[in-house]
């Protein structure tokens, strides 16, 4: 961001912060060589669009991202299913991954390096808070 435009910093500053927690201790996020996950609708990838989301896992059980427009922080829990979708997406765009357990890495290894690029918003995303973030 140091070399980014003032517009990018302004957009991020106006979005607030979303903190996503995994409530089940058995589950965890992986980190990939391309760790930032950008979720976009098909017609745009502009971060000033409230439907575009950007997330980064910062701990095995915590992910942070841009929050709702003109709001402060939101802290939400994520479902097991969406932890898996998030991990698969990070793996797909990464050439290397690391995680908390051998079993987790083995289960995600088929997804590693399959595609680099933007990812559409998952159709199966079932978090009620996610819809609130986009409005």
Predicted ranges, named:
Residues 1-135:
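Alpha-helical structural context detector biased toward long hydrophobic helices
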């Amino acid at each position: 961001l140091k070399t980014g435009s003032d517009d990018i910093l302004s957009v991020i500053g106006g979005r607030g912060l979303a903190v996503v927690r995994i409530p089940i201790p058995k589950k965890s996020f992986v980190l990939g060589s391309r760790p930032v996950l950008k979720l976009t609708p098909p017609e745009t990838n502009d971060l000033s669009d409230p439907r575009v989301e950007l997330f980064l896992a910062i701990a095995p059980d915590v992910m942070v991202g841009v929050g709702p427009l003109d709001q402060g922080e939101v802290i939400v829990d994520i479902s097991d299913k969406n932890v898996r979708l998030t991990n698969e997406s990070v793996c797909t765009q990464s050439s290397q991954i690391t995680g908390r357990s051998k079993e987790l890495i083995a289960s995600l290894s088929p997804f590693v390096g399959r595609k680099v690029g933007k990812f559409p918003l998952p159709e199966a995303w079932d978090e009620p808070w996610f819809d609130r973030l986009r409005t």
